[in-house]
Amino acid sequence: LQVYEGLPASGKTKAIISEMDRRRSLGDQVMLILSNEHEELTRRPDGREGGRMGCRDSTKKFQIDRVIGTAEACEWLAEQVAGSLIVFDEAQYFDSKIVPAWLEASERGVDILVGTPSRMQLKALNGDQYDLKKLEVMCSCQKRNATRVMYSEDLTYPTHLCDRC
């Protein structure tokens, strides 16, 4: 079980797509799952099965396999086989009830990759074994790692700020 965390525009989705591409190139089954429980994802033109998840790097895209709710995701995960990679990007849009299904699938040998979990999901993991990949980005002052972002007119590229800026 791998968990990717970081501020917006820190490279989480790019890193996730790179890992999905790597695993698919090895011949592994790779599936990308998004939540249908929040309009932030489903109102996007590509936020559907067969759509393409992208990031700020226009060369990085990956086809979305399923757009489903938490209950369906839990049932679906129970059917997945060892050695496959199942990715939940923007995972914070799933209910925290999905966490036991992630853990159970992981224990069966299914590789689970979780991008941007909610605080409740992290709390539900409760110290269970997972590999945390925390992506850092420099503050705009270039002296320290950013701890927050600020959006102005551009909602795609936020300004990264540290505690002192």
PLM features: what roles do these ranges have?
Residues 5-10, 88, 109-112:
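Short linear motifs at secondary-structure transitions and domain/linker junctions
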Residues 81-94:
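Conserved P-loop NTPase "ATPase switch" module shared by AAA+ and STAND
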Residues 27, 82-84, 109:
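A general structural motif
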Residues 1-80, 120-127, 154-160:
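Conserved P-loop
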